[in-house]
From Swiss-Prot:
Enzyme class: transferase
Positions contributing to ATP binding: T58, V59, G60, G61, S62, G63, K64, T65
Family assignment from sequence similarity: Belongs to the LpxK family.
Organism: Shewanella oneidensis (strain ATCC 700550 / JCM 31522 / CIP 106686 / LMG 19005 / NCIMB 14063 / MR-1)
Catalysed reaction equations from the record: a lipid A disaccharide + ATP = a lipid IVA + ADP + H(+)
Pathway membership, UniProt: Glycolipid biosynthesis; lipid IV(A) biosynthesis; lipid IV(A) from (3R)-3-hydroxytetradecanoyl-[acyl-carrier-protein] and UDP-N-acetyl-alpha-D-glucosamine: step 6/6
Keyword annotations: ATP-binding, Kinase, Lipid A biosynthesis, Lipid biosynthesis, Lipid metabolism, Nucleotide-binding, Transferase
GO CC annotations, alphabetized: plasma membrane
Name assigned to this protein: Tetraacyldisaccharide 4'-kinase
GO biological process: lipid A biosynthetic process; lipopolysaccharide core region biosynthetic process
PANTHER family for the chain: TETRAACYLDISACCHARIDE 4'-KINASE, TETRAACYLDISACCHARIDE 4'-KINASE, MITOCHONDRIAL-RELATED
A GO molecular-function annotation: tetraacyldisaccharide 4'-kinase activity
InterPro entries cross-referenced by the UniProt entry: LpxK, P-loop_NTPase
Length: 335
């Protein structure tokens, strides 16, 4: 099914035309929903600290999670104390939940588990963004909230919006769901503060981002050996765009004997992956690794990547953030 969807969205498959009436209905529903907030019929909650939303206007992986990790590290280096909220897609909990390094990905979601494992950032997950953000502020002394995904969740007031675009797949056929991959029209890019292009050329008023491999690490915390890069390996990925991961491995010179794609947010078990690896080294993404660490074998590895953005982006974002923070601080003191 996913292969057919990709053909419709990115390769001009004629079934797109049959889906266009449904896309028109989707456009009407989303426009109506936005108008409720614009007209004040539905309220938007403003928080006392700056809120940065990192999202996209397409379905599927675009690089939001590495962007969030980049922002966490950037803000910390500048003296901020950021916290993160997320939906926790596929997680098994009710209400809101604080994410810890001990939490399984099945309990809090793949991306939250990965973000906290990498950074240790204060993080709360929940279906309702406003409720989740308030819980974060109640339980942690954060001065900036980063919302991982949630561009279309207008009930949460935001001060800075970042959209991440896949530089290779772009916006596909530029149709709204289900005929195309768009959650909102291309016009939305003109309203956000920053457009980040992941792994592709950026045009005017956009910022290019590269995901650069930084280490090959064992999935199991108990393993102390280093990876032997001369061995042929089996590659697997359960992310929004697995082909990008496989291409990265090839570009890094690894001998990929077999590659296998899983669905995004796939749940794994030990026997399934042992059969796939067949005693060969198994290489996966960092997002997959957080789901496998409890039953990982000695020859299972993951490729850690770091996002790289320009100093110009850093400067523009920090300038905007400091301006927002000062204004909110002034209001809290009655200035």
């Amino acid at each position: 099914m996913q292969a057919l969807v990709n053909k419709i969205w990115y390769q001009g498959h004629p079934l797109r035309w049959l889906l266009l009436p449904l896309s028109a209905l989707f456009a009407f529903i989303t426009a109506f929903r936005r108008s409720l907030f614009r007209l004040g019929i539905k309220s938007q909650t403003t928080l006392p600290v700056p809120v940065i939303v990192v999202g996209n206007i397409t379905v599927g992986g675009s690089g939001k999670t590495p962007t969030v990790i980049y922002l966490i590290e950037l803000l910390r280096n500048q003296g901020f104390n950021p916290g993160v909220i997320s939906r926790g897609y596929g997680a098994q909990f009710q209400g809101v939940k604080v994410v810890t390094v001990k939490d399984a990905a099945t309990d809090v979601g793949d991306e939250p588990a990965m973000i906290v494992a990498r950074t240790g950032v204060p993080m709360v997950v929940g279906a309702k963004r406003v409720e989740t953000a308030k819980a974060l502020l109640t339980q942690f002394a954060v001065d900036v909230i980063i919302c991982d995904d949630g561009l279309q969740h207008y009930a949460l007031g935001r001060d800075i919006e970042l959209v991440v675009i896949d530089g290779k797949r772009g916006l596909g056929n530029r149709n709204l769901l289900p005929a195309g991959p768009l959650r909102e029209g291309e016009w939305r890019l003109n309203q956000v503060d920053f457009v980040i292009v992941n792994g592709g050329p950026a045009v005017a008023n956009q910022y290019e981002m590269q995901l650069r491999p930084c280490a090959v690490l064992p999935v199991s915390p108990a393993v102390t050996a280093e990876f032997d890069s001369t061995q042929p390996l089996v590659a697997m990925a359960g992310i929004g765009h697995p082909a990008r991961f496989f291409e990265t491995l090839t570009q890094q010179g690894y001998q990929v004997a077999l590659s296998h794609s899983f669905d995004d947010h796939q749940a794994y078990d030990k026997r399934q992956l042992c059969e796939l690896a067949a005693s060969r080294p198994l290489m996966m993404t960092e997002k997959d690794a957080v789901k496998c660490r409890d039953f990982a074998q000695e020859n299972w590895w993951y490729l850690a990547v770091d996002a790289k953005l320009s100093p110009q982006f850093d400067q523009q974002l920090l300038s905007r953030l400091r301006s927002v923070a000062a204004a909110k601080k002034g209001k809290s003191h009655g200035v």
